[in-house]
Structure formats: structure tokens, C-alpha cells
């Protein structure tokens, strides 16, 4: 667990761990990516310290403070200003600006996962607003998980969940510490598996599944919203109303086994509770204090349970859902660990919206735009626009057949 002083640490203190982590699962391209990422992060730190940029730029540290930039200094406005700096001050081509900002955004996401930041500032709409648009991007250019990618990713989480469960069963009962560690890993693996299957097969937007910190109405789905017997889940839609979405057969078994592993004390628990140590710890301590326990009693309970999430489960202390940033971080980790092939100009991992678009392509090709629109919770007009490359390809094939029939 990270110390509470993490947010007050300097930015470059994290670089060594970050570069070690991103080197996992990247194969021969890892060194090139790390070198470029290191260069751009060092430039960002120099800019944040006021050592880069126009003459009037003094950095993000308060004028009365003589120190290096820290995580406490970061905000949406800081990343927006840096995006503006990349766009305006360095004469870079727009695709280069997008690439350089992506290095920074990837590090910011890692910092959220590791607990240095609570919010993925770099992905906020206001932060990315100054970035140039991707000129010439066609609807078919946007990421959509392919059949091979879905299979590779789901096979990986299947194997990981099975192996974690097997390891848990092999740990002797007289080794409680090892048992707790194995139980935690089995829980996380089961949660990862359920999340991947939902993203891969339901076409539900990630903001409808998990918590969005900027919108209190999007608190993440709870078990009371899920009916495994009916194959449905109630979600708060983009159109700002509750609606039922379908749970296809491939999703049911991962969800059922995950629920059995989690064993929530009530159906009001989030389906995907955060496992972020600091967040769970804070929730547990505050709730136990509200129930009248003193610090010594709380400390004893926490020491006896090894992991705060297990204490929360045993005492029915509901912890919040994982956030949209956390879900993206989870998919990044799984993508890297699974060695799935990802070739995309904007994303180096299988992003949640790519899972949704991948299912959209399957449905449009199999059943047409009307059925796909209902499943995607979109208008048929919008679906036709976003998946116009499919119709264009089919029309091209039809034209080729017609030419062959007529011209012989």
C-alpha cells in the first residue's frame, strides 16, 4: 500500500517504477516506447517547473514555494495548459502532439492505479480540448475489438481466474497470511474476468457499468440491478434514464462465479467494488468509527483481517464502485499481461469503447442496423453513421459482383 504522503511526492520519483511496469508484456517494442515516454515525461516535468515554455511561463508550483512540482500541484487545468503548450509552442505535427500527450496520459493513468492521483486528469474533456482533432479519421478507423482480440482476452482472464482459484485451494489452512493473499488474488482475477466479459459482449458503456466521479447519479451497478436468471442488468443510460440491458450467455457464468467468489453480504453492494487500498481503508475506518469503535478496536480488526476489503465484506461496509479511470487501468493491465495484439494509432490497449464498437460491428453484420441500434441503445441513424464503413464495404462487394455478372 502506498503511503499517505504519495500525493505530496515529486513527479519524477515515480518514473523508475512506471518504466519497469510498462516494460512488462511489450516484447521488442518496449525499449523504444520507454525511451520516448521517458523523454516526454522529463520534458513535462521541466515544463511544470517553469524550465520550458514561453518566457512568461513560471511553472505550476506556487510562486511562494521553492520546490519541485508535486502531485498536489496537478489538476485538469495543468494538463490542459500542457496540451496547449504541445499544440502551440513546439511546432509539432498534430499526430505527434497526440502521441506525445498519450505518453503523458498513460503515466497519469498509472498514477491513478498506483494511488498517487485520485483522478485521471489527463483524460478529462477539458484537459484534452486543446489537442488537435484526428484529421481524416473514418468511422471504421476507431478501435473495435476483433474476434481474435476478444478470444485472446477472454481466454487470458479465464485462465488467470482458474489458476488463482487453484492456488487458493492449495494453500494450507494453517497459513492464514498466505491464504489471505491467495484469496485476494482470486477475488481480483474473478472481478477482472467478469469486467472483461461485460465489456466484450454487452456493448454497455463503461460509464454505465462503473462509477463516474463527475456524476453522482452514475454510482456503478449494484447486484440488485443484476438478474442472472433473466439475463438482464439495469443501467443508468447516457440518455439519463434507467433501462434494462441484455446479458448474453457468455457473460452469465463469469458473473455468477465472480459473485460466488465475492460473496457480497447484500445486493446493495457494487458489482465491481474498488480494490484500491487507500480508498477501501478510508471507507472501512470511517464506517467503523461511525459505528462507535475506537481507534484501537478498529486497528485490531484491520490487523486480524489482513485485507480491508475482506473486513468490509464481513462487516457489510459497502465500498464504492471502481471508477471509469480504474476500469480503464484494469483493461490496460490485462491487455499488457495477455500479450494480445493491439495495433491502433490512439490506444495501446483494448479500450472499453473498443469492446462496445466490436459488438456493434458483430450485430450490424449479423442482424442489420435496426437490431444493432436497439442493443447499442442508440438511434438507427447514429448507428448507420458510426458503422457506415460496413455498408460501404458490402455495397462495394455487391458492385463487384454486378460488374462480374454483366461484363462476364
Q: What spans do the regions from the language model cover?
A:
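Basic, Lys/Arg- and aromatic-enriched nucleic-acid-binding interface segment
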Residues: 152-206, 210, 266
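A short, glycine-centered helix-capping/turn motif at helix boundaries
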Residues: 115, 189, 198-216, 365-367, ...
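Short, basic (Lys/Arg/His-rich) helix/loop patches that form interaction surfaces
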Residues: 294-374, 381
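Catalytic-site neighborhood detector that most strongly recognizes the C-terminal catalytic loop/helix
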Residues: 376-401
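Conserved tyrosine-mediated DNA breakage-rejoining catalytic core shared by Y-recombinases
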Residues: 211-306
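Flexible interdomain linker/hinge and immediately adjacent N-terminus
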Residues: 61-65, 117-175, 390
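C-terminal secondary-structure termini that scaffold catalytic or DNA-interacting sites
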Residues: 129, 401-408
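N-terminal core-binding DNA-recognition domain of tyrosine recombinases/integrases
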Residues: 16-32, 38-141, 182-184
Amino acid at each position: 500500500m502506498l503511503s499517505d504522503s504519495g500525493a505530496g511526492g515529486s513527479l519524477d520519483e515515480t518514473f523508475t517504477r512506471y518504466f519497469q511496469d510498462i516494460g512488462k508484456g511489450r516484447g521488442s517494442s518496449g525499449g523504444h516506447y520507454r525511451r520516448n515516454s521517458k523523454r516526454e515525461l522529463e520534458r513535462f516535468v521541466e515544463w511544470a517547473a517553469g524550465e520550458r515554455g514561453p518566457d512568461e511561463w513560471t511553472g505550476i508550483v506556487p510562486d511562494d514555494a521553492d520546490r519541485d512540482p508535486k502531485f498536489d500541484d496537478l489538476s485538469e487545468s495543468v494538463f490542459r495548459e500542457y496540451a496547449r503548450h504541445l499544440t502551440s509552442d513546439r511546432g509539432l505535427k498534430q499526430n505527434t502532439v497526440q502521441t506525445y500527450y498519450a505518453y503523458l496520459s498513460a503515466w497519469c493513468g498509472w498514477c491513478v492505479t498506483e494511488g498517487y492521483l485520485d483522478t485521471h486528469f489527463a483524460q478529462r474533456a477539458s484537459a484534452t480540448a486543446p489537442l488537435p482533432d484526428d484529421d481524416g479519421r473514418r468511422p471504421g478507423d476507431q478501435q473495435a475489438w476483433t474476434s481474435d482480440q476478444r478470444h485472446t482476452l477472454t481466454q487470458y482472464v479465464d485462465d488467470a481466474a482458474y489458476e488463482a482459484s487453484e492456488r487458493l485451494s492449495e494453500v494450507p489452512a494453517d497459513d492464514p497470511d498466505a491464504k489471505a493473499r491467495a484469496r485476494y488474488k482470486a477475488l481480483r482475477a474473478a472481478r477482472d474476468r467478469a469486467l472483461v466479459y461485460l465489456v466484450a459482449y454487452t456493448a454497455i458503456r463503461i460509464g454505465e457499468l462503473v462509477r463516474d466521479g463527475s456524476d453522482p447519479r452514475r454510482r456503478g451497478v449494484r447486484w440488485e440491478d443484476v438478474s442472472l436468471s433473466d439475463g438482464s442488468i439495469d443501467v443508468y443510460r447516457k440518455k439519463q434514464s434507467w433501462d434494462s440491458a441484455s446479458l448474453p450467455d457468455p457473460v452469465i457464468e463469469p458473473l455468477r462465479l465472480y459473485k460466488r467468489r465475492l460473496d457480497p453480504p447484500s445486493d446493495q453492494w457494487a458489482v465491481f467494488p474498488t480494490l484500491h487500498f487507500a480508498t477501501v481503508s478510508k471507507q472501512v475506518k470511517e464506517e467503523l468509527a461511525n459505528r462507535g469503535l475506537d481507534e484501537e478496536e478498529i486497528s485490531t480488526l484491520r490487523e486480524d483481517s489482513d485485507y480491508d476489503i475482506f473486513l468490509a465484506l464481513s462487516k457489510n461496509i459497502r465500498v464504492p464502485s471502481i471508477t471509469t479511470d480504474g476500469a480503464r487501468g484494469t483493461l490496460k493491465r490485462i491487455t499488457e499481461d495477455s500479450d494480445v495484439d493491439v495495433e491502433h494509432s490512439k490506444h495501446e490497449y483494448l479500450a472499453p469503447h473498443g469492446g462496445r464498437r466490436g459488438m456493434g460491428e458483430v450485430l450490424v453484420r449479423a442482424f442489420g442496423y435496426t437490431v444493432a441500434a436497439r442493443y447499442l441503445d442508440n438511434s438507427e441513424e447514429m448507428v448507420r453513421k458510426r458503422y457506415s464503413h460496413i455498408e460501404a464495404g458490402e455495397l462495394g462487394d455487391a458492385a463487384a459482383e454486378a460488374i462480374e455478372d454483366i461484363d462476364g
